[in-house]
């Protein structure tokens, strides 16, 4: 399974590590994915992986089951 948010499709970010000696190495920041249960349109609940930012938004709009 890809490390992506299943609702917003937010994926990892890429950048550089910079050491004290100014050496550059590539690195990846993964999204903080958390499992949660969401109500679908037909009233059923589905378990999905969402980022913590999306989880906050779902809690704000009462979309969690």
From Swiss-Prot:
- Name the Pfam families for this protein: Ribosomal_L28
> Its domain of life?
Bacteria
Q: Where is this region: Disordered?
A: 1-21
Q: Which GO terms describe its cellular component?
A: ribonucleoprotein complex; ribosome
Provide the alphabetized UniProt keywords. Answer: Ribonucleoprotein, Ribosomal protein
Gene Ontology terms: biological process:
translation
Instruction: List the molecular function annotations (GO) for this entry.
Output: structural constituent of ribosome
| PANTHER family in UniProt | 50S RIBOSOMAL PROTEIN L28 (PTHR39080), LARGE RIBOSOMAL SUBUNIT PROTEIN BL28A (PTHR39080:SF1)
Q: Which NCBIfam families match?
A: L28
Q: Which family does it belong to?
A: Belongs to the bacterial ribosomal protein bL28 family.
Protein's name in the database:
Large ribosomal subunit protein bL28
Question: From which organism does this entry originate?
Answer: Mycoplasma pneumoniae (strain ATCC 29342 / M129 / Subtype 1)
Q: Which gene encodes it?
A: rpmB
